[in-house]
Amino acid sequence: MKSIMVVGTTSHAGKSLISTAICRILSRRGWRVAPFKGQNMALNAYVTANGGEIGYAQAVQAWAAGVVPWVEMNPILLKPQGDMTSQVIIRGRPVGRVNAADYYEQYFEPGWRAIEESLQHLGTEFDLVVCEGAGSPAEINLKHRDLTNMRVAKYLNAPTLLVVDIDRGGAFAHVVGTLELLEPEERQLIKGVVINKFRGQRSLLDPGIKWLEERTGIPVVGVIPYLQEIFPAEDSLDLLERKTHKAHADLQITVVRLPRIANFTDFDPLESEPTVAVKYISPKQDLGHPDAVILPGTKTTIADLILLQKTGMAEAIQNYAASGGTVLGICGGYQILGQMIADPEGIEGQAGRYQGLNLLPIRTVITGQKIARQRQVSSNFPQLGLPVNGFEIHQGRSRVEPQGDSQAFQPLFDDVNLGLVDSCQSVWGSYLHGLFDNGPWRRAWLNRLRQQRGLKSLPTGVANYREQREQMLDNIATEVENHLDLTLFLP
C-alpha cells in the first residue's frame, strides 16, 4: 500500500494542515488519494453519507482529496464528555463510554483491528493514503499503546514527515528531542522535517537548518510560511483568542463558548462574511449587546445548561431575548433554549430533569440511541423555499409542546422536527449542523439582522460555503506546494 505519514513534534504543530495540503496537491497531480487518522479526539464531527461519525478534519481532508468522506478515514473517534470520560466511536458507530484509565484495556485490540481493516479497505480503493498522527509520536508514557502515530507508520512502512511549529519557539530542540525518543526502526521511517509557521527572513534560518540536517542526518524538506487562511481547528482552545475585529463589520454576533462546545466549525461561514464579526465569549463574561447571540452544539448539554444558570449567562440571554434580541440555538444549544431536558437513564451523568431557558416550547429527553444522518430540507424562514443541507448528531429527542397561540412558533423547515422560530423571528432553534454553509439561507438570516439596524440587505444569490472552502484548500495547497519537496515521499 502506497502511503505517506505525517507526525508532529507537538500538538498544534500543523499536522492537519500539512496532511490536508498534501491531499489536495496529490489530487491535483492525478492521484486518487484518501486521508486517514487512526484515532482522533475531537468534538468537531461530520456525518458521512451512511450515517457514520468521523472527525470533521478528516472530512475536510477528504474534500481536499476530491473524494467523499468515509468512516474508514477515521476508524476511531473519541468525543470527550467531561469527568475524564469519552464516547467511543468505532467505524462511525458509538460503542460505549469509558474513562481514560480503562480505555486502552477495553478498546486497544478492537481499535487496532478497526485501523487495520480500514487501511486495507482504503488500500484497495485508492492510489495512496495520507496518514495523520496525533499529538507527538514520542510520548514515552503512551507509546506502548499508540494507535495512531508510529505504530501506523511501521504497519505501512510509510515514509514519514515530522512537522514542527517554529512560531512557538524551541523548534530545533523539539525535532532533536523527538528523534532521540523514537526507536531506531521508527526513526528510520522519518524521511524529512517540515518547519511550519515560519515568519521572517529565510536566510536567518538557514544556519539552523544546516546544523539540524548535520545533527540528525535527516533533510529539512519544507519551510512553510505562517498561513493566514482560516483552517478548521480540531479543538476549541483558541476560540477565545481569535481576532474578531473587522474594520468594516456591520454586525456583531456573539457565540457562547460552552465548555464542551461541539462543531464550532458551524460558524466558519459567518467568520468568512466581510460584514460580520464573530466573537466567542465564555459563560462568565458579560454578554453585551450584540446583534445576535448563538448557543452552539455541546457534548454535555445538561452540564453546560447548569453552568449557564450558575454563571448568570442563562438569565442574561433570557433578558436579551425579552428585549427583542435575536437568539439562535444549534443542536445542544437548541435543547437548552427549551422548557426542559430530561435524562432518565443518566446518559450524560446523573439522571434527572432540568429546566431550560424556556425560550422555545420544546421538551427534550436524552436517550441512548444517537441520531446521526445527513439532511436535505427546504426552509420556511427567514425565506420560504430555500434548499438547506446539513447533518444531525444528537442523542436527545425533542417534542414541541402545544401552545395557546398556534402561530406563536413555526417550524423552521419542512421537517417540523428539525427546528422552530418564534413569530417575531427573534428566537431560533435547530438540530441542523452546517446551517450557515448554505449561502442563500445564511444571507437571508443576516439580512433580518441588518434590517433591524436599518442597513441595506445583502444579495442572497451567493454560493454555498463549499465554494469558499474549495478556494481555501486550493490556496493552502498552492502555498505548501511552493515550499515543500515531496520527492522523497512519492514512489
From Swiss-Prot:
Chain segments annotated as transmembrane: none
Domain GATase cobBQ-type, first and last residues per copy: 250-441
InterPro entries (UniProt xref): Class_I_gatase-like, CobQ/CobB/MinD/ParA_Nub-bd_dom, CobQ_GATase1, CobQ_N, CobQ_synth, GATase_3, P-loop_NTPase
Recorded superkingdom: Bacteria
Disulfide bonds: none
Record-stated family: Belongs to the CobB/CobQ family. CobQ subfamily.
Protein name: Cobyric acid synthase
Species whose genome carries this gene: Trichormus variabilis (strain ATCC 29413 / PCC 7937)
Lineage, highest ranks first: Bacteria, Bacillati, Cyanobacteriota, Cyanophyceae, Nostocales
Gene (UniProt): cobQ
